[in-house]
Amino acid sequence: MENILQIVLISITQGVTEFIPVSSSAHVNLLSKIFGYEDIELIINVSAHFGSLIAVTFFFRREIFEFTKNKHLFFKVVIASVPIGAIGFFLIKYEIISNLRTLEMMGWTTIIFGLLLYISDKFQTKQDIENSFTVKNAIVIGCFQVLALVPGVSRSGIIITGARFLKFNRIDSAKISFLLSIPALGGWSLYGFYDLIKQNDGWLNTGAVLTAFLSFIFSYLTIKYFLVYLKKFNLSLFVGYRLILGIILLFVVYL
């Protein structure tokens, strides 16, 4: 029963927080601290991310199909994904990221990058994906995405921040974040599956399937309703939430 509860909590947390600007890693680590899940199984972690990957790919299947026909847009998505892929592989290979994954680090980054998100959201909108997602903008957003390798920053959050600084509207900023999540989550999933094979770890078990399924459902719903939310409201709610979460994380550390 405890394992089922862990699977449900991790899946929901991953699904909900992966695509909104609040840092999924901070939430998963806080969850682990609260419930004593000190060592989340690799298969659960990989399955949760894989479920999110399938959800975002399915949700944007039409856009992805259009991208494959539009070589220029497809090329720009690739360009924006190269920095995090190259640097991320190096940092993961030499376990540099794991050394940064502390509640203290995530507390501070959650607050600092939450404030950056607030500042960026004040920029006036002048650009959209159709006309302004240039090679230059793709490179800049790709460089912003590298910062997501620092635990607590939030991949979705930092891409939206970068896009808003470049004066993309909120909806398109979120869409850029979602589309760039596909190669990022795909790369992470492949690396995770490779690790599972290398460790000869048991996979494709009931727990893995349940994790991926729940993560898919909650990821899909989050993407759908986050876009609905952005049509009416700004990002202040998420900024406030990040500040509160960061304070809670630091409170846990320094208490």
Predicted feature descriptions by range:
Residues 1-255:
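Multi-pass membrane proteins that catalyze or facilitate reactions on polyprenyl-/lipid-phosphate substrates
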